[in-house]
A protein has these predicted regions:
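Extreme N-terminal starter segment of soluble prokaryotic enzymes
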Residues: 1-5
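Flexible gly/pro-rich beta->alpha loop and the following alpha-helix that scaffold active-site loops
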Residues: 20-87
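Gly/Ala-rich beta-loop-alpha elbow adjacent to hydrolase catalytic centers
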Residues: 88, 92, 97, 101
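Pocket-forming structural segment of enzyme catalytic cores
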Residues: 100-186
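Acyltransferase
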Residues: 183-252
């Protein structure tokens, strides 16, 4: 078994705490940085998992500054088709959706920034990862785009009032999270520094950072076990009875 493939789409959004949790679970990782001219691998042979992170590029139409995104979409289609455990966060969740004919648009509700709660949906009760997540887990939000239509066959796992598609599963081994679980203080501080979104919202950067830092402990309490369970799935340590089978999705 090789290393889990991590696609890092932005130097300001790396694995950070998520990487620490996966290391604790003994999941080896290899990071691909397309923004630094790393080629997006076309082959997923021997990959136990695929993780696609967030960042400034947008999945709303072609992004000329991120010409690698179509290749990432193709990789996600292949991962889902071949039942490789997959996790998309932020932009990664958007790409998981658009790769399978979902829709991502600029959010009509406006930007969502800072700590928030999301609500689990009924389907989460039988999900191999979300079944252990609290009913209203703490998360961090930092986005202006949102998934407005899930791919056909996707299972909604978490929602909020103004942003209804907060988490979903596609097939039986691929998850998309609109929100962020990987952040630490330094990452949030970097995002806040000079943020035009915060300026538009008239939110002081230090206030937003402090609010995010206050919930980091709660986020770790919920999402560290989630990450460890994802790693266990990737390493083949979860019994098949924990994983609901679905019909295969079309893809290459």
């Amino acid at each position: 078994m090789g290393s889990a493939l991590v696609i890092e789409n932005d130097p300001t959004d790396d694995l950070r705490r998520l990487g620490e949790w996966l290391a604790e679970a003994n999941l080896p990782i290899e990071v691909c940085r397309p923004y630094a001219d790393d080629p997006v691998p076309a082959d997923l042979a021997d990959r136990p998992a695929v993780i696609v992170l967030g960042g400034r590029p947008s999945a709303v139409g072609p992004d000329p500054a991120a010409g690698w995104l179509p290749a990432v979409e193709g990789l996600l289609r292949k991962a889902v088709r071949h039942r490789i455990p997959t996790l998309g966060i932020g932009l990664g969740a958007h790409l998981l959706a658009t790769a399978h004919a979902g829709t991502v648009e600029r959010s009509a509700a406006g930007p969502e920034i800072g700590p928030a709660l999301v609500g689990k949906r009924d389907a989460a009760a039988t999900d191999p990862l979300f079944r252990y997540v609290p009913l209203a887990p703490d998360v961090l939000q930092w986005h202006v785009d949102e998934i407005t239509e899930l791919p056909h066959g996707a299972v909604l796992l978490a929602a909020s009032t103004h942003y209804p598609h907060q988490a979903f599963r596609l097939g039986d081994r691929a998850w998309g999270l609109q929100f962020h679980i990987e952040c630490d203080r330094d990452m949030v501080s970097t995002w806040a520094a000079g943020s035009t979104i915060l300026t538009e919202l008239r939110l002081p950067a230090d206030v937003v950072v402090d609010a995010c830092v206050e919930v980091l402990g709660d986020i770790e309490e919920v999402w560290q076990p989630f990450a460890v369970r994802f790693a266990a799935l990737a390493l083949g340590q979860l019994p098949d009875s924990d994983i609901p089978r679905t019909l295969p999705l079309l893809g290459s």
